């Protein structure tokens, strides 16, 4: 209030390293599967924020700055990048939704961009660089230190989108088993985040065939994984 904004500059320096992982296909940006992973984004880089499967932007940080500039009645064409000064006056701030809610949205929408940015939060929390490598090391390191066998895992990103990623079926089984088992209660919330067959997320229209005695709808919680010519599913089924 009482302050006239004359220019908008975006500090995009929080994340380090490249913003596009090895093994990603640039065409996936236009398919809505991924965006360059930049520290400043609006709606995970979607060009149509109300549509989960919207194509993504190739310049999400710049777009975020331009959106702010337009809201402040500053010419969006003048937006530039700069590092924040060590001191300065805070004019406004915004807080993200709680982590558990962002994890839920990530799982239900199978949102690769959210997976990458949350991976960088884990990296920061464990003292690692907020980069692709730092996030992978943080996530796999935390699982391994908790007793989850990650032997054979070789990842270059946190979302699993890269064609260079390698996980074994045993890795996935170990993660789900740890969440369902009695020894790692901190992982139990993972089960609640998994989509429900015939009910939510990427399983909302699957496992609907059969009658009430044979259908998996409502009984299966699982996470899908899909790449070209590759499909996987890992989860739990409630039995009688």
Language model segments and positions:
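Periplasmic/cell-envelope proteins involved in peptidoglycan metabolism and beta-lactam response
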Residues: 1-38
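Noncatalytic linker/hinge segments flanking ATPase motor cores
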Residues: 10, 47-57, 196, 216-219
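Intrinsically disordered, low-complexity boundary segments flanking structured domains
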Residues: 25-29, 141, 206-209
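A small/polar active-site loop signature that marks catalytic segments
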Residues: 31, 36, 42-188
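C-terminal soluble interaction/assembly domains
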Residues: 154-240
């Amino acid at each position: 209030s009482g302050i006239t904004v004359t220019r908008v500059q975006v500090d995009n320096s929080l994340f380090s390293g490249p913003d596009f992982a090895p093994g990603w296909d640039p065409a996936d940006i236009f398919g809505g599967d991924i965006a360059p992973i930049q520290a400043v984004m609006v709606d995970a880089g979607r060009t149509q924020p109300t549509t989960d499967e919207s194509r993504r932007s190739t310049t999400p940080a710049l777009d975020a700055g331009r959106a702010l500039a337009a809201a402040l009645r500053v010419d969006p064409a003048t937006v530039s990048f700069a590092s924040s000064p060590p001191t300065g006056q805070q004019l406004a701030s915004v807080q993200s939704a709680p982590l558990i809610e962002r994890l839920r949205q990530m799982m239900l929408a199978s949102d690769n961009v959210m997976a990458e940015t949350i991976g960088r939060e884990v990296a920061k929390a464990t003292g690692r660089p907020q980069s692709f490598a730092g996030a992978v090391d943080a996530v796999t390191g935390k699982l391994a230190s908790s007793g989850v066998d990650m032997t054979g895992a070789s990842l270059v990103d946190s979302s699993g989108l890269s064609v260079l990623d390698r996980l074994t079926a045993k890795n996935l089984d170990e993660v789900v088993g740890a969440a369902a088992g009695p020894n790692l209660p901190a992982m139990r919330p993972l089960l609640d985040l998994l989509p429900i067959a015939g009910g939510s997320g990427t399983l909302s229209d699957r496992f609907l065939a059969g009658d009430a005695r044979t259908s998996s709808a409502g009984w299966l919680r699982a996470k899908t994984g899909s790449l070209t010519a590759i499909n996987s599913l890992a989860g739990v089924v409630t039995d009688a």
